[in-house]
Structures are given as structure tokens and as C-alpha cells.
Design a protein with these regions (language model features):
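Helix-rich catalytic cores of soluble enzyme domains
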Residues: 26-220
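A generic, well-ordered mixed alpha/beta core segment in the N-terminal half of proteins
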Residues: 3, 8-43
């Protein structure tokens, strides 16, 4: 459908403290505070983990983010798992929050983010995490992040082709696991600054690329 839904951005590891005005590492309480704002805003429809808390062990940070999400909002959410073990635990959390396994399948509000390694690679861990989600019948969000001029060709058409190939390859695996399982077509392209070697996430070309990829998503 031609409808636009918005989510917040993630995953910040530093924040400007509203009390002191200083830049500092993010903590778990920041996730709670940000989610309260997201939950209250009618123009933000989906919650994406906003920060990577630096005051908890890095191995369990994803679990802490999931806990915050399930405790402080009833909006749809995108989660990221750090391991297959965590993926299974997050699915259990989602089932409890939904009122049971069948209720979660009937009305899933939890999708799991997985990224490819452009061009044309996916990590073993990402594959295993996504397959667990597909087996549970929950949506997977395949987020492809081509970098025009670096991990994808400098041309628009070439970058879109690489992006699409990354997505289709990953989704083919998931459809083999559970045919017809919902998959979100994700795009977060950036552009290579050839002079400074930086990734530009707000260059004009980025929006052209993402618009083209949005059109590709409608094709499927």
C-alpha cells in the first residue's frame, strides 16, 4: 500500500545529555527515556532500538534493548539479536508480551533486523538468527547497506542491482526455511566520500538510491 510509516533511528553509542549539555556514552536509561518520547508521538509508528547502552555488557546489550522495548511500548518494533541464543529468548519475550505464541503469529508486532555484508555476502550468524525467526513465523527485516563507490558500483543502476541481489539471496534462504514468511525489504544506502574516505549518510545521492530501492520493493 502507498502509505508512509516512520520510525526513529538507531543505534547511537553517544548522546548529548539534556541535563548537562555534555556528550557522553549512552546508558540503558537513555533507551527508556527515548522510548517514552517515541511511544507518545503519533507521527512515529515503529520503534527501532535507539541506542546501544554502554553501561551493560556488550554481549547482552541487545537483550537489554529488547527488555526496554517490550516494557515501554505497544507499538510495532524492530529488534536486533546478538546471537541465536538471544534470538530464541527474544521470541519468547515477544510471545509473552503478545499473550501467547498463536496470538503473536496472528498479529506480529516484532520484526528482527539482519544486515548483509555487501557485496553479496551474509554472515553465518545473521543467517542462523534469521532462520530461527522464519521458523517461528515472525517477520525478518533484511537491511542492505550498500556504499555507492565502495561496496557497490558508482552508478545508480549498479548500486541498485547489488542491493537487490543481496536482498534476494538472503530472502531465498528464508523462504526455503518457511515459504511465504513475511520479509521486509530494507534499504540504508550511503555514498563513499572519495576524498576523505567517509560514508555519507545524508548526501543527495543517498535519497535517490533509497527511493529507487523503495520502488524495487514494490515490484516484489
Amino acid at each position: 500500500q502507498d502509505q508512509v510509516y516512520a520510525s526513529n533511528f538507531g543505534e547511537g553509542i553517544c548522546i548529548h545529555d539534556l541535563e548537562t549539555g555534555e556528550r557522553r556514552p549512552t546508558v540503558k536509561q537513555d533507551a527508556v527515556d527515548i522510548l517514552r518520547v517515541v511511544d507518545a508521538l503519533d507521527n512515529i509508528h515503529i520503534y527501532n532500538r535507539a541506542i546501544g547502552p554502554q553501561d551493560v555488557p556488550s554481549q547482552s546489550a541487545s537483550m537489554h534493548n529488547a527488555e526496554v522495548a517490550f516494557c515501554y511500548t505497544s507499538k510495532p518494533m524492530h529488534l536486533v539479536s546478538g546471537s541465536p541464543f538471544q534470538t530464541r529468548k527474544m521470541i519468547k519475550m515477544a510471545e509473552i508480551a503478545a499473550g501467547g505464541k498463536e496470538e503473536l503469529k496472528r498479529r506480529p508486532r516484532t520484526a528482527f533486523n539482519h544486515t548483509t555484508i555487501s557485496p553479496l555476502r551474509v554472515s553465518e550468524e545473521a543467517c542462523e538468527n534469521a532462520m530461527i525467526v522464519a521458523e517461528a513465523g515472525l517477520p525478518n527485516h533484511i537491511l542492505v547497506m550498500v556504499q555507492q563507490g565502495a561496496t557497490s558500483p558508482i552508478s545508480y543502476a549498479g548500486s541498485v542491482a547489488v542491493h537487490n541481489a543481496d536482498f534476494l539471496a538472503f530472502n531465498t534462504l528464508l523462504q526455503c526455511v518457511n515459504k511465504g514468511n513475511p520479509t521486509l525489504y530494507g534499504a540504508s544506502a550511503c555514498v563513499m566520500d572519495m576524498k576523505k574516505g567517509l560514508s555519507l549518510v545524508a548526501a543527495p545521492e543517498v535519497f535517490v538510491l533509497n527511493a529507487a530501492m523503495a520502488r524495487m520493493s514494490k515490484y516484489y
